[in-house]
Amino acid sequence: MRILIILFLGSTLFSCEDKKTKVNKIVPKKSTSTPLTKDVNPEKKESDFILNDKNVMEFFLAYDKKHLESTVRITTDFGLIDIRLFEATKFHRSNFIYLTKKKYFDQTQFYRVIPNFVIQGGNSDDRPTLRKRQKIGKYLLPNDHDKGFKHNRGMVSMPSSSIENPYKLASPFEFFIVQQQGGAHHLDGDYTVFGTVINGMDVVDKIAAVPTDSSDWPLQNVFIQKVEILE
């Protein structure tokens, strides 16, 4: 099953780099930002949208004005992790709230675990996760790294896509939590920090300690049972 993820999720997988991992360097893409269209009308039912690179920015600008929640709870196999999302990174906060309300993260996994570095979640190698992605759409988010947030321990950040991506556009379906003591500041500027753990770092540490295979995938799957809005 783990091989399947390369086949049907490869275009949006993470590329959060550590000292052993390099991000592909590729030809820049032209901007796909377009003016607000009827397809991105904020009065249209949100459930009717299929997001893409042309409408995602306008959609989340409108979504941000109506959905002001900022605190979420991640229920994992090892316990609860509460996260506060930063208002300053509005696209990433709104994206996380949107996916939470869509129940996208439910039954995904922490699929990349590196002790004293990060735990990365929001993906899976099963077909239900693929189908949820297809219903939501295919899109990337801008790198919004200049809001003053650093990759300190406990910070929540968004990895970049593994596709041709010199601007480190963010893969919206995944996130990682910095577990490293003292932070992982070599990531600053390359990835968008959009939240922080306010309760449950002991759970993060437990997940970071699980045995993994050569690709950093836990030998025993660590599930995100659900993500819910607290306030």
What are these regions (language model features)?
Residues M1-L4, D18:
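Positively charged n-region of N-terminal signal peptides that target proteins for export
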Residues L4-T12:
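Sec-dependent N-terminal signal peptides
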Residues C16-E231:
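Cyclophilin-like peptidyl-prolyl cis-trans isomerases
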